[in-house]
From Swiss-Prot:
Basic and acidic residues: compositionally biased ranges: 1-10
Modes of activity regulation: Specifically inhibited by an endogenous cardiac glycoside, ouabain.
Keyword Methyltransferase: no
Name listed for the protein in its UniProt record: Sodium/potassium-transporting ATPase subunit alpha-4
Tissue-level expression: Expressed at high levels in the testis and at low levels in the epididymis.
Its job: This is the catalytic component of the active enzyme, which catalyzes the hydrolysis of ATP coupled with the exchange of sodium and potassium ions across the plasma membrane. This action creates the electrochemical gradient of sodium and potassium ions, providing the energy for active transport of various nutrients. Plays a role in sperm motility.
Residue ranges crossing the lipid bilayer per the database entry: 97-117, 142-162, 299-318, 331-348, 782-801, 812-832, 853-875, 928-947, 961-979, 995-1015
């Protein structure tokens, strides 16, 4: 290097890694920063562009100014580290805890309650200023209680969210990482953060890859790319460029993936945020999440309730002015009516209902990180599911065998209980099992004797482990077989030879050897001049070649990984003690005898086909999005029902009819498999057309950026999208989705952090349970809100008549609080435990634009019908008690000014009796207590009718024990508040005569009968006028 000349350290294209610019002291304009951030995000959404995999070794050496044997010098490495910074990922921006707490305290529904509290304090302030020492403190108490409700509920919600975050923290496994680099010709172990661009790095089996590396030499190297690309099989690595796409070529190994076996040496071409994994992490943390459907619904509800409150408040403000009240009284009335419209207990009810459902879902293996995600899952209309580990078992398993010219099916179920079998008595099976068990480098880890064979941990790659377990279950213990047939020589599998060979001593003749081989079927078949049939050896013929070709195509077409097996009994001159040379090959490698084929696949989970079928019944579109090969993806999609029977792709139809694909009638095609390379060049409109035109879709060989584009496409079409995934490659899509679902067992930390929900058992079927719970809580929240809002009318109307008719106040502020935060709370929450009215998984997902949590019909039913009957019940009781005490209803009109006059102690009733101020107030508070009890009694009927929206109560039954407890609780609480000594002082509640409890009972019966008749008409005339106007 020339003195003073900077070393060239740039990687091309999208992964360009430039030296860090010096920090400027001047303040940069914020607007360009925001634009730049948005532009950076758009850049990150594009495909990875690099050409390092295409360069020759000399070009690579020149580009990074590195010696391919000695590596960088220590000084050069320090210089590059200073320019580019450490090899770490920039941590995503985290939300401070105080901001999270404030969101819970001031977001959504809390804002409405805070507004109500502020108005209460304002009204109290006006009262104090106007009336001095005689000011009514009800508004002060109401303001304090509202503030307390918001703070307590906010703390509860924050605690729930923080608890989920702590569970998330427990998933992390922070292990300091080391890397082996060669600098100045010497090997040295350094911290991964100190690895720099151009470093010569060596990796071996068990290592985590420290950066994006271009391989320059490899010996049997295989890497596990499943977290990055979704491929469940380990991928072999070599120095040669095998594909234009840098993610698919075999001469690049990626940061954060694992080397499972072999060794490799290579040059670092990207570090930190510039690696493929770094780009994904940056893309994930840069994405903005939209509002959850339930947050939108609560916002809609706030707008609705605020509009009603303001309309009533303003209307009665002007009415008060017209009736001759002072503007000060009119303002206090205005505030009072607005506050009376605020359902104080509803925030706590909704929070508790969501929390109960979240706990119920956790018991069913769905851990919800955000309470609002509980309902989002119920609204889902499209599920974009990863394949590996979610739909499949995430373990390679033997699926089929072909020997004696017959294909046999193996047991691929998770518990190995289907009882599928094959002729184990065949002598050919003896040879095939022996080859699969002996020519195999996998082994069981120690101390697992009590663990079922299928679930034992192994060393070795996925395919060899699958063969090991299969032979252990179906034949003999492999360890015994290996002891009796010790291995004396071996050629490991590599991507050039495409076979593995081993030589063993024969157990029945300790002087003779047998050569065993397995590998790519066509390669193995080429070595053979004979084949086994029913244990007898026959010379190879054209019929056998045709049978082999058909079997290979059949098994390969199922998306399975097929291996061929053959053997050769070595002549007697290769006796015990012979030194086999696997480099010079001093032994025969031709004229082998072909034994058969064994194919493997990562099989579907047992419960998935049923779960996909339930999704289809529920109107949910399930799309497979995977990084795996199209043939494998399509095979799994067909086996789990994502591509259903009879719905063929254009390629299937063309093959069946033996016509070109161009001649296939597009109208008859319902399913499609889209390759990532096609998606790469697609315009948004073309993607939208595919999503709209095809019912059953599989996206294969997709990159992380493409997964994100697919999610955005579904959202553009108005879908509520759930995305499942476990790898780093899934995290951008998980973050962008309406609800991201990560895998708890196999999921990466990055995917868990990006998701809203974690499947603790990694099972797709658990999602369907979650959808059912989400739909149920939406239905039950509607019922709970309808129940809670209904009592608003009997709470508001006393205040309105107090203004209009100038009668003594029928219901006090403190009494309203006793209803909203006392008697109504447990019954409202009990509706969260209500079972579904019908099979909620048989109906279409709700339309977020039209099917709102609180709609005009619900408000109409709660306020305009049931609420009005409840108000009548309350006023009936109120007038009965006043009449019994001497005040006839007509004589009460306009009496308020005299009634509330503290100086007037001789007010006459309808019969000429005189009443002092204190006596009048005792009667007034007794009436308010009776009005309160009347609301409780009519709320019995309201709670029972809210159990169903369509079904008759006689069909639904009273199986909800929590609801029965709620009925008892509100009754006991009402009696407690009425009869316990001291309540007359603290809450102005007075004991009632027993017969006053029965005044509201006819109205309670009326509510029940009226609603049963309404539901009967709705059931008899579906879609009729009554359903359109009253079914909420």
């Amino acid at each position: 290097m020339e003195p003073g000349k900077e070393k060239e350290v740039e990687a091309p294209g999208e992964l360009n890694q430039k030296p860090r610019p010096s920090t400027r002291s001047s303040t940069t304009n914020r607007q360009p920063k925001m634009k730049r951030r948005k532009k950076d995000l758009e850049e990150l959404k594009k495909e990875v562009v690099m050409d390092d995999h295409k360069l020759t070794l000399d070009e690579l050496s020149a580009k990074y100014s590195v010696d391919l044997t000695k590596g960088l010098s220590i000084l050069e490495a320090q210089d590059i580290l200073f320019q580019n910074g450490p090899n770490v990922l920039t941590p995503p921006p985290t939300t401070p805890e105080w901001v999270k707490f404030c969101r819970q305290l001031f977001g959504g529904f809390s804002l409405l309650l805070w507004t109500g509290a502020c108005l209460c304090f304002l009204a109290y302030g006006i009262h104090v200023n106007y009336y001095k020492e005689n000011a009514n403190k009800d508004n002060l108490y109401l303001g304090i209680v509202l503030s307390a409700v918001v703070i307590i509920t906010g703390c509860f919600s924050y605690y729930q969210e923080a608890k989920s975050s702590k569970i998330m923290e427990s998933f992390k496994n922070m292990v300091p990482q080391q890397a082996l680099v060669i600098r100045d010709g010497e090997k040295m172990q350094i911290n991964v953060r100190d690895v720099v661009l151009g470093d010569l790095v060596e990796v071996k089996g068990g290592d985590q890859i420290p950066a994006d590396i271009r391989v320059i030499s490899a010996q049997g190297c295989k890497v596990d790319n499943s977290s990055l690309t979704g491929e469940s099989e380990p991928q072999s690595r070599c120095p040669d460029c095998t594909h234009e796409n840098p993610l698919e070529t075999r001469n690049i190994i990626f940061f954060s993936t694992n080397c499972v076996e072999g060794t490799a040496r290579g040059i670092v071409i990207a570090t930190g945020d510039y690696t493929v994994m770094g780009r994904i992490a940056s893309l994930t943390s840069g994405l903005q999440m939209g509002k959850t459907p339930i947050a939108t619904e609560i916002e809609h509800f706030i707008h609705l309730i605020t509009a009603v409150a303001v309309f009533l408040g303003v209307s009665f403000f002007w009415l008060s002015i017209i009736l001759g009240y002072t503007w000060l009284d009119a303002v206090i009335f205005l505030i009072g009516i607005i506050v009376a419209n605020v359902p104080e207990g509803l925030l706590a009810t909704v929070t508790v209902c969501l929390t109960l459902t979240a706990k119920r879902m956790a018991r069913k293996n769905c851990l919800v990180k955000n309470l609002e995600a509980v309902e989002t899952l119920g609204s889902t209309s499209t599920i974009c599911s990863d394949k590996t580990g979610t739909l499949t078992q995430n373990r390679m398993t033997v699926a089929h065998l072909w020997f004696d010219k017959t294909v046999y099916e193996a047991d691929t179920s998770e518990e190995q209980t289907t009882g599928k079998t094959f002729p184990k008595s065949s002598d050919t099976w003896f040879y095939l099992a022996r080859i699969a068990g002996l020519c195999n480098r996998a082994d069981f880890k120690p101390h697992q004797e009590s663990v079922p064979i299928a679930k034992r941990a192994t060393t070795g790659d996925a395919s060899e482990s699958a063969l090991l377990k299969f032979i252990e279950q179906s034949y003999n213990p492999v360890s015994e077989m290996r002891q009796k047939n010790p291995k004396v020589a071996e050629i490991p599998f590599n991507s050039t030879n495409k076979y593995q060979m081993s030589i063993h001593l024969l157990e029945d003749n300790s002087e003779a050897h047998v050569l065993l081989m397995k590998g790519a079927p066509e390669r193995i078949f080429d070595f053979c001049s004979s084949f086994l049939l029913n244990g007898q050896e026959y010379p190879m013929d054209e019929e056998m070649k045709m049978d082999f070709q058909n079997a290979y195509i059949e098994l390969g077409g199922l998306g399975e990984r097929v291996l061929g097996f053959c053997f050769l009994n070595l002549p007697s001159n290769f006796s015990k003690g012979f030194q086999f040379n696997t480099d010079e090959l001093n032994f025969p490698m031709e004229n082998l005898c072909f034994a058969g084929l064994i194919s493997m696949i990562d099989p579907p989970r047992t419960a998935v086909p049923d779960a996909v079928s339930k999704c289809r019944s529920a109107g949910i579109k399930v799309i497979m999005v995977t990084g795996d090969h199209p043939i494998t993806a399509k095979a799994i999609a067909k086996s789990v029902g994502i591509i259903s029977e009879g719905n063929d792709t254009a390629e299937d139809i063309a093959a069946r009819l033996n016509i070109p694909i161009s001649q296939v009638n597009n109208k008859s095609v319902k399913a499609i498999v889209v390759h990532g390379s096609e998606l790469k060049d697609m315009e948004s409109q073309q993607l939208d057309d595919i999503l709209k035109s095809y019912k059953e879709i599989v996206f294969a060989r997709t990159s992380p950026q493409q997964k994100l584009i697919i999610v955005e496409g579904c959202q553009r079409l108005g879908a509520i999208v759930a995305v499942t995934g476990d790898g780093v490659n899934d995290s951008p899509a998980l973050k962008k989705a309406d609800i991201g679902i990560a895998m708890g067992i196999t999921g990466s930390d990055v995917s868990k952090q990006a998701a809203d929900m974690i499947l603790l058992d990694d099972n797709f079927a658990s999602i369907v349970t979650g959808v059912e719970e989400g739909r149920l809580i939406f239905d039950n929240l509607k019922k709970s809100i309808a129940y809670t809002l209904t009592s608003n009318i009997p709470e508001i109307t006393p205040f309105l008549l107090f203004i209009i008719l100038s009668i003594p106040l029928p219901l006090g502020t403190i009494t309203i609080l006793c209803i909203d935060l006392g008697t109504d709370m447990v019954p409202a929450i009990s509706l969260a435990y209500e079972s579904p009215e019908s099979d909620i998984m048989k109906r279409l997902p709700r339309n977020p634009k039209t099917d709102n949590l609180v709609n005009n019909r619900l408000i109409g039913m709660a306020y305009g019908q049931i609420g009005m009957i409840q108000a009548l019940a309350g006023f009936f009781t109120y007038f009965v008690i006043l009449a019994e005490n001497g005040f006839k209803p007509l004589d009460l009109l306009g009496i308020r000014l005299y009634w509330d006059d503290t100086q007037l102690n001789d007010l006459e009733d309808s019969y000429g009796q005189q009443w002092t101020y204190e006596q009048r107030k005792v009667v007034e508070f007794t009436c308010q207590t009776a009005f309160f009890i009347s609301i409780v009694i009519v709320q019995w009927a309201d709670l029972i009718i809210c159990k169903t929206r369509r079904n008759s109560l006689f069909k639904q039954g009273m199986k909800n024990k929590i609801l029965i407890f709620g009925l008892l609780e509100e009754t006991v609480l009402a009696a407690f508040l009425s009869y316990v000594p001291g309540m007359d002082v603290s809450l102005r509640m007075y004991p009632l005569k027993i017969n006053w409890w029965f005044c509201a009972l006819p109205y309670s019966v009326l509510i029940f009968v009226y609603d049963e008749i309404r539901k009967l008409i709705i059931r008899r005339r579906p879609g009729g006028w009554l359903e359109k106007e009253t079914y909420y």
